[in-house]
Amino acid sequence: DYDVQFELIDCTTGLPLEDHIAPNTSCYLRVTNRTPELLYMNLLDIDSKGNKYLVLPMDAAATCAHLLVPAMSTWSFKAEPFIFGDEPSDETLLLMAVREPVDFSIVMDTIKTGGQGTMRVGLNRRFYQVK
């Protein structure tokens, strides 16, 4: 529903990572919001065993303000770096974007908005191999 994209940026080089990533690579998320709306974003990592991880943590107050990406802009989450594991793995990364603050840990269920039905969600998926 929303025109959003992401790439992973190598913390050491500052360059986008390719589809094949070396083990223990440290990186951060850079997202592009091509909509006229302010959007909350998070990244879900699904490994080859089906384990799921949210890349960006919730803030203590659960306001999600740190997950906001301005309209028509590119934003780097440099303050939230993460490291791929040391074992070979296939990783599917799914960017989620919504207009209202959401506890993204609920992504295993249908996302609802205040009991008023489903909400529009922007998704962008990329596949990486750690080897």
Q: How does the language model describe each region?
A:
Residues D1-K131:
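Secretory-pathway glycoprotein ectodomains that are cysteine- and/or Ser/Thr/Pro-rich
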